[in-house]
């Protein structure tokens, strides 16, 4: 298993065993720590940031026709075989949208993706790297992603 999480401790390392357990319990190939499933929560985000993130995930779900509530989540447990089967050199996105592309790639390769609720805490130090270029990459990129070929 390979884990991904934010380096600023917005994700609670104590939740790592829950991600691992959920992969095993639900026979999931990918387990996503989700802010937007029942029981999930975001702590200390302004309402505008919350709604922007929530509706961005809704947009992705509708455009890509995937059933993941938190498409930009960065707290993930992958089975090793998932990452070995995805050509990481062929990932198009460099901003936050790579989170979307990785989940979509896993689904297109036939892997089972499961979400579990987490409590996401906004960073206490530093600033978000979100900017208009990253937003544009995600917004337009999701439309382009529909036509990407997956082997």
Name each model-derived stretch.
Residues 140-151:
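C-terminal, non-catalytic tails of nucleotide-sugar-dependent glycosyltransferases
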Residues 38, 108-111, 143:
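Charged, amphipathic alpha-helical interaction segments
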Residues 1-3, 13-96, 123-133, 138:
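Acceptor/aglycone-binding surface of glycosyltransferases and processive sugar-polymer synthases
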Residues 67, 90-94, 103-120:
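Catalytic donor-sugar/metal-binding loop of nucleotide-sugar-dependent glycosyltransferases
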Residues 6-10:
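The conserved acidic donor/metal-binding loop of glycosyltransferases
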Residues 79-82, 111-112, 145:
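Secondary-structure boundary/capping motif
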Residues 100:
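DNA-recognition element of transcription regulators
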């Amino acid at each position: 298993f390979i884990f991904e999480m934010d380096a600023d401790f917005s994700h609670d390392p104590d939740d790592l065993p829950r991600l691992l357990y959920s992969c095993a319990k639900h026979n999931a190939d990918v387990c996503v720590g989700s802010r937007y499933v029942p029981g999930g929560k975001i702590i200390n985000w302004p309402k505008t940031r919350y709604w922007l993130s929530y509706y961005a995930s809704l947009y992705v779900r509708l455009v890509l026709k995937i059933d993941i509530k938190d498409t930009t989540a960065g707290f993930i447990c992958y089975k090793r075989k998932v990452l070995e089967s995805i050509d990481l050199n062929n990932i198009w996105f460099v901003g936050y949208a790579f989170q979307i592309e990785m989940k979509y790639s896993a689904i297109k390769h036939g892997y089972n993706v499961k979400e579990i609720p987490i409590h996401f805490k906004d960073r206490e130090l530093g600033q978000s790297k979100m900017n208009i270029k990253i937003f544009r990459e995600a917004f337009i990129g999701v439309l382009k992603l529909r036509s990407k070929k997956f082997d």
